[in-house]
Structure formats: C-alpha cells, structure tokens
C-alpha cells in the first residue's frame, strides 16, 4: 500500500492553491503516480475551486516533481480535468512549468502531447482557456500554450521557446505580469468578468449612468465611454500601439473593445482578428472604435494575410457588432474596421469625423492638382474635400453608416445599441469552417 502524502506541499500545489479563493481548492487525481515502481507522483497538480465565487478548473505543472516532465499519465490527468470542466461549463486555467517530454517513455510521451492538444482544441469556444506561463514552456508545450485563448507571462520567469532558449522571442501574450502573484491576479480578473462558457452571459450591475454625456479625445475615448472607466486591455504588447483590444462593461453588459488608432499593420490586424474570434465564440458584443488612415506606408505584401484574417473575423462573427467612427476612417481603414459592409449591425460616426476613400492631401494631389491657382490654394482645396467628400453625412446619405451623432452622445448611443442587440440571433450558411489565410 502506498504512503499517504497527497497533501505534501510542492511548488505545483502551492501555485494552484494560491490561485483559488481561500479554502476552496479540491484536488483531483491526487494519488496518480508514474513509473513501474510507482514511487514518483505525477508532475502535474489538477483540481477545481472558486474564483470570486465562480467555478474554475486549474492544472499546474509541478517543477518539484521530476521538473514537471510530460508523459502519458500527465496527459491523462489533464484530460480528466478537461472532461470535468467541459461537462460543467467552467473555464480552464493552465499553469505551465515543465522541462518537456519524459524522454524515457519515447513515443508514448509524444503521443501524450497530442492528447493534450486535442483537449484544448475540443474545449476551444466552449469554455475560456487561460495559460499562465510561470516557468519553462518549450517545444510542444509552447504550441499548446499558444492554442489557449489567452496566455499570461511573467517578466524574468517565463521561458518560452521552440527549440533553443536563445530564440525565446515573439510569443504573443495577452498580459505580461511583473511577478507570479500579479499573473494569477490578472487571470482571476479575466475569469471573474468572462462568461463561464459559450451558453453563459456576463453582466454587471453599475451605477454609471448610461445617458451621461462624455468628453474625450483619441487617447482617452475608451475610458470615457465604458462603465467606471474600467478597461481590461489584452494583447497590449502584440501588434503595436495602433490597435488596442480589451474587455469592459458598457451599461452593465460585457463588451470586447477593438480600437484602431493610427496606421494599420498586419500584426495589429491579426491581433484584432483573434480577439474578435474569441468574443464571437462566447457571445461577447464587439464595439469597434475607428480612427485610422488605413494601411501603414511601409508594409510588405505578407501583411495581407493579417488583414484577410481580420476580414474573416468580422464577416463570420454573429455576435452583436457596433462600430463608431470617432476620427478618420480612410480607405481600407473604413472597410476593414467593422464597417456595415463587413457585418456591423450598427455603425455611426461623430460629427467631426472624416470618411473617405483618400485623405484630403492625397485626393488633392491625385485628382485636383490642376485646380491649384493663385486664387485657389492647396489648403483650401483640401478643406473643400473634407467638407464635401469626407463629411460623415455623405456616408450616411449613401447608407454606409446609420447615423451621425454628437461626440457627447457616444456612450448613450452605444448603450442603446447594445441593449437592442442583446437578444440578437443570427445564423450562417452550413459549413465546417472557413479556410483561413496563411
């Protein structure tokens, strides 16, 4: 008979217990051991508990048990956890810290990674999945972590690489934390606001008046329109500053905010596409804010795939989609950033916005150079273009947007549209899936 030491404190058990509300962690598969002699406990701790009162399932790879080496039993424990999480409609959090496959097991450990990947793939879009990378995450573990909806890394501790540690760059984390406790706090924050599963919704009582007027500029617009100025940004370090994504409550309803503020890049478009896809999976309304002149001037043709993914994301999403042009929406920036033509349910523009195929400067240079005279300056022609061709009323008259509003009305109009669309039901033609670009 084996010795009774399931409550031995290890690095993995410490991490998983500290993640949950105090006293709520319940371990599953605690007695599972590896090897023929059965002397070593498996290098992953699994269990469930409460996060701000919500059920969640967590596995933590245990660096104190054979450095968290991955084998068939490791995958079996994780599969047990995933089966329970999906049946109960609760999110999964994975704490990654493993040296990799247990090489003594040969192909069995390699097949175990396939089992792990299948668990993550089948749960994708069913329950939220968040990876916290607190230590080593290499090779196929890095592939699995990238399959999660969002990953949280820790400065100075996360070691993410495919083949050699000196190539550890380029991983797109949703959040980069200063330390492990902040990483856990960020994961708990996300779990507390997100729906528990794809049949759930997320609402929050608020005292922030839906009808309050707002004042904003392009730097603080998000904080001005969301409830209590509380915006949880994700993927901040991916794709540049010109594309911002994150979660907030607007009128008590959870929304995914996508904000294009500057020249669009392929990486920024890819980030927005992933975020919109997540929101669509869990019925989270997407609010798009637009202030862009379109493509960045120095992009290569390879960026087209990122923009193609963005187009797919908007056109295939059936969740409520609301777009507001708050500055410029020029050329491809208008079309790709949640326009009505790619599926927005409601789109409006503030009075001072500009919607046009070209900027005023380019329009005059390409189309009106011959009209520049001593009496008609380039500047006056550009002003005429903005007034006559880029005026949002022109777009409204053509049915490209639904309304032109005062900027002070932005929050109340967003709230009204969100409430109207809260019971939206839309179906798409039957198919397996879209064929995404590479």
Where are these regions (language model features)?
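Ligand-binding clefts of soluble mixed alpha/beta catalytic domains
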Residues: 1-438
